[in-house]
């Protein structure tokens, strides 16, 4: 869906009214950016681009702006953020909005204006008259958070928009390296396309050569190596992080966050929750939940709780300066490796 919108915009095709909604911030922001590039010239954007936040600005003002002729250009772009009245959420309004005026506008929009409602909400209230009117008269685009497979598919399709191809294995590895962040995937695909030049395919080797692991992904890999009893590789990742001037206290905090996520994921999975439900409950990216689910199978609940307790003690000791931070973290990692070696049936 989103690629169809981007393809149309690249051809210069626009709709008079858009309603962009969903929780995937990158898809919302990137789509708005592409609409802006298509509709408004750089030279006239100061005159013909208006942005309103309905938590602060009256809706009437946005509609009045939409009905104003563009100045020194063919079209005007009006972006309206946070139209919370499209949801079922009850909140105390700072400003009273004239919603009926918006209903009238979208049924007969100004031919020289592109009007964008930017609604960063998971769902719109389908019962509302305005939502029904939007579904009938506006172009609707949902920017939902993607699971692991959808993120891989997104990566493959993103390469296609650049007239390049990337295989599933290479795409999965790229997604893994950037922790599933769509904005990072976009940047890395741009970089990879530039690197391969006239060559059509982005290979796994290209990805391994050019894409650096995020700090979060390094922490995931560190824990992964530990649970798979790879002592040398575990310590190599840790020492590499120190060489990159990452603070031990920051590394420890990320390790702690990951183990808490593993424990929470394990609990919800045992209650029968799926990946998407767990991500929604924990308010984390579905891709992070997938990685945590894989690691959760390698620990008992008791082990996870003990590790989290040890990390809490270490956090206190680091912050009070009682012991050397690097030494504390090294000892913790070695103890964790020793525990997993003892749990190895071949040990």
From Swiss-Prot:
Enzyme class: transferase
One GO BP annotation of this record: DNA-templated DNA replication
Predominant place of localization: cytoplasm
Pfam family, any one: DNA_pol3_delta_C
Subcellular location per the Swiss-Prot or TrEMBL entry: Cytoplasm, Nucleoid
GO cellular component: cytoplasm; DNA polymerase III complex; nucleoid
InterPro entries per UniProt: DNA_pol3_clamp-load_cplx_C, DNA_pol3_delta-like_C, DNA_pol3_delta_N, DNA_polIII_delta, P-loop_NTPase
Subunit comment: Component of the DNA clamp loading complex consisting of tau(3):delta(1):delta'(1). The DNA polymerase III holoenzyme complex contains at least 10 different subunits organized into 3 functionally essential subassemblies: the Pol III core, the beta sliding clamp processivity factor and the clamp-loading complex. The Pol III core (subunits alpha, epsilon and theta) contains the polymerase and the 3'-5' exonuclease proofreading activities. The polymerase is tethered to the template via the dimeric beta sliding clamp processivity factor.
Name of the molecule in the record: DNA polymerase III subunit delta
Designated gene of the protein: holA
């Amino acid at each position: 869906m989103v690629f169809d919108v981007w393809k149309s915009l690249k051809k210069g095709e626009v709709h008079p009214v858009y309603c962009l909604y969903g929780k995937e911030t990158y898809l919302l922001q990137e789509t708005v950016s592409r609409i802006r590039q298509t509709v408004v010239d750089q030279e006239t954007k100061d005159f013909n681009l208006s942005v309103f936040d309905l938590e602060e600005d009256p809706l009437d003002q946005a509609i009045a702006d939409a009905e104003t002729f563009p100045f020194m250009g063919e079209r005007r772009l009006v972006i309206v953020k946070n139209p919370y009245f499209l949801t079922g959420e009850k909140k105390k309004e700072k400003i009273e909005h004239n919603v009926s005026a918006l209903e009238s506008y979208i049924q007969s929009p100004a031919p020289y204006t592109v009007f964008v409602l930017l609604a960063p909400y998971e769902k719109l209230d389908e019962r509302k008259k305005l939502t029904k009117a939007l579904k009938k008269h506006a172009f609707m685009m949902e920017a939902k958070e993607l699971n692991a497979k959808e993120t891989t598919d997104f990566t493959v399709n993103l390469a296609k928009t650049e007239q390049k191809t990337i295989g599933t294995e290479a795409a999965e590895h790229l997604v893994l390296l950037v922790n599933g962040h769509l904005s990072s995937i976009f940047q890395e695909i741009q970089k990879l396309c530039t690197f391969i030049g006239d060559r059509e395919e982005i290979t796994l080797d290209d990805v391994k050569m050019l894409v650096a692991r995020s700090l979060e992904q390094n922490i995931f890999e560190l824990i992964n190596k530990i649970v798979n009893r790879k002592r040398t590789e575990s310590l190599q990742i840790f020492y590499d992080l120190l060489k990159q001037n990452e603070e031990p206290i920051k590394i420890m905090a990320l390790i702690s966050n990951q183990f808490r996520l593993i424990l929470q994921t394990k609990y919800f999975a045992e209650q029968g929750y799926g990946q998407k439900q767990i991500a929604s409950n924990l308010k984390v990216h579905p891709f992070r939940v997938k990685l945590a689910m894989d690691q959760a199978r390698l620990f008992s609940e008791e082990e996870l709780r003990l590790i989290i307790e040890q990390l809490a003690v270490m956090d206190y000791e680091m912050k009070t300066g009682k012991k050397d931070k690097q030494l504390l973290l090294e000892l913790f990692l070695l103890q964790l490796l020793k525990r997993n070696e003892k749990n190895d049936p071949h040990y």
